[in-house]
């Protein structure tokens, strides 16, 4: 009896399954609010995630099966999915543009609204005021954060002429060495993924400098991503299918992990 009791107390903790760590973010919506923290890959890192447009400005508009696709809704959904991926890897995340009702959505056509705020503040209609507002919030949070690796990620959905299919394009601020490195690591990750999942298609996305307001006026190292052409019928598949939106978020997260890992080498 003593031997059996001894085995129970010694082996039980070893055999018991370790309870997974979890977090909760209401902005993800009821179905996705709770997430598991599966690794510490991004422990000590902090991210400022900004989806394009929002509030009174829907951004680019495409037509899919007779219904409108609004850029701000798709950029926001992907930002939320990216935030969840980063949090699951142990990162600290600030979601700058917020809609307390939407959450992560799995539908094809994401209904448009003007509810979005910038950290709770109404979003101005004036473009410069709108961009300044989000940059000011990023910079304010940046000054408070003590993390050693801090990055801002801006996500948009490109709207070129209807006939052009686009890939994913990565931009960094002029002369930003760290921004360029992050953009390159994201690009290489996408290139590998396309080679694996669509080997006959090829990946034609590029990395380049771009003198954008948000890249010039944010303090943390920043990248700006154009995720597709919302007006192109073929390219719309990258946006309307939930699995594709999730894949975009996954790949961006993997590229970020790669970028951080290279610093530690």
Residue ranges and their predicted role:
Residues 2-263:
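Catalytic-site microenvironment of enzymes
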């Amino acid at each position: 009896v003593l031997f059996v009791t001894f085995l129970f107390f010694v082996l039980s903790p070893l055999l018991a399954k370790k309870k997974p760590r979890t977090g909760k973010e209401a902005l993800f919506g009821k179905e996705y609010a709770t997430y598991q923290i599966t690794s510490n890959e991004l422990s000590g890192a902090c991210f400022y995630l900004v989806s394009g447009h929002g509030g009174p400005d829907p951004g680019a508009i495409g037509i899919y099966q007779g219904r409108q696709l609004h850029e701000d809704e798709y950029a926001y959904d992907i930002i939320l999915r990216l935030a969840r991926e980063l949090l699951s890897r142990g990162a600290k995340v600030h979601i700058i543009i917020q809609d307390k009702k939407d959450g992560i959505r799995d539908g094809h056509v994401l209904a448009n609204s003007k509810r979005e705020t910038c950290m709770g503040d109404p979003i101005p209609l004036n473009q410069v005021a709108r961009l300044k507002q989000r940059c000011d919030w990023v910079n304010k949070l940046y000054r408070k954060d003590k993390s050693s690796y801090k990055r801002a990620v801006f996500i948009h959905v490109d709207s070129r002429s209807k006939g052009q299919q686009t890939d994913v394009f990565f931009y960094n601020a002029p002369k930003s060495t760290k921004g360029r490195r992050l953009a390159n690591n994201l690009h290489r990750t996408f290139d590998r993924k396309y080679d694996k999942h669509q080997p006959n298609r090829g990946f034609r996305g590029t990395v380049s400098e771009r003198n954008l307001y948000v890249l010039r006026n944010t303090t943390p190292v920043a990248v700006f991503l154009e995720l597709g052409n919302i007006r192109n019928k073929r390219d719309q598949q990258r946006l309307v299918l939930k699995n594709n939106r999730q894949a975009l978020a996954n790949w961006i997260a993997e590229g970020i992990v790669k970028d951080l890992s290279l610093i530690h080498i």
